[in-house]
């Protein structure tokens, strides 16, 4: 009898446990948002869409192209992905107008996603990039405001960009001569160039990455077949360059990880390369801040900006000016200034470098466009064109607006989609395209598919928000017959006098984000890209590379970066 009781007790316990497990399993299954399309069958799997997306990433190195493919399969401007057990679905929006409306006009319903903080927080905890759009965020943006003023960008940042671009031209002239028609990998040279110019612009520190690389470049090369990449031998990069690139790579590491909040802090604590890179970088910034402090705190007259040579200088000067005006001791919150300026590096070095890398690809793939671009540059920069060995100066590049150059850069942005997605978070229940999105949901606004590079999915105008309907005519719509072609002319409008004018509202494209959470450094990025494209096209014929070194395959991390950035260059002067 005792045995029977024990057996029945065990049976009851087992049944209860089984029922609990079944209930727990069902609770962990994805909970679709009513009415929003999704991939059938994924709602019945504990891990939802995650296995399919991870398989795609492992096969292609991309993430957002999977979302683009799913948008096409579902033929819907809005759909949902199930990526986390017991978590809310990700809502993906491919419609440009609705994404623009969410980011610009609906600030009381949407804010930046917590994902941004998880990625950048461990490495720049005091930067506004990870803050919600609140008073603290606004105070940090106010602190940085003058670093984006037209005068500062043109007079201080412009010459630094030009110097670094000229350094890249010098290095590539040497490599083009040694390669003698063979292609070579340009990716690391672009990274060195961007580190040089952003660190110098931000902190006033000359990393000299390109110079050190060129000086150590061996003149002895092993010649190979014309289509085989030339491999150069050079000394190791400087500690400054290595440290900064290593630290910046942490952002991409976090983005690629399923657990960004964990992986980067662990790397900074336990990986010697990351720990030493952070230590070196913080020490360098402290020294530059000290130099700027000494320069301006002891100055008799701080009413003029002639001594400003970097963003660090400018921030220290503004604090000294404010302190003297208010009759108090000046003070500098070094961790805040350090992290805000480091964010320029981490965001700018990766995204801008990727954008320039893509431009090299599209110039090589479209020789007629490259020829037209060079003709327009030489027609506009007459002094440099008529002076043997000369290139446009920094001020000439800043002051000269060439519609075709602007159109090429815009079309390169449209195809490169360096930032393939803008992520927002619902801070209250919100209606998007007729669907109620619950509070606390992440919204992924794609910039790489329908309405941008392919025809839009159909949308009933009546389900759009009122602000979206009101802005219907703000942007054009791309011609569906050629939306997939690389065509800079689509951005140009003929004026009554016959001249062509660049129209940035010609159609959907979103390279820097929009609204209050758009890229803060857009003015720096614009000038970097304009200067680099001008200098490269002016000085080199960018020839086609063999098929196995070409292609538009990409890798998604901190940016949408080309997997292969090989160039075949012929110096023109």
Curated annotation (Swiss-Prot):
Pathway: Secondary metabolite biosynthesis. Heme binds at residue 519. Induction: The expression of the dibenzodioxocinones biosynthesis cluster is positively regulated by the transcription factor dibT. Its main location: membrane. It is found in: Membrane. Its cofactor is heme. SUPFAM superfamilies: Cytochrome P450. Disulfide bonds: none annotated. It is a single-pass membrane protein. Pfam families: p450. This is Cytochrome P450 monooxygenase GME11363. Keywords: Heme, Iron, Membrane, Metal-binding, Monooxygenase, Oxidoreductase, Transmembrane, Transmembrane helix. Belongs to the cytochrome P450 family. One of its GO terms (molecular function) is oxidoreductase activity, acting on paired donors, with incorporation or reduction of molecular oxygen. Its EC number is 1.-.-.-. Signal peptide: none annotated. InterPro entries: Cyt_P450, Cyt_P450_CS, Cyt_P450_E_grp-I, Cyt_P450_sf, Cytochrome_P450_monoxygenase. GO terms for cellular component: membrane. It comes from the Eukaryota.
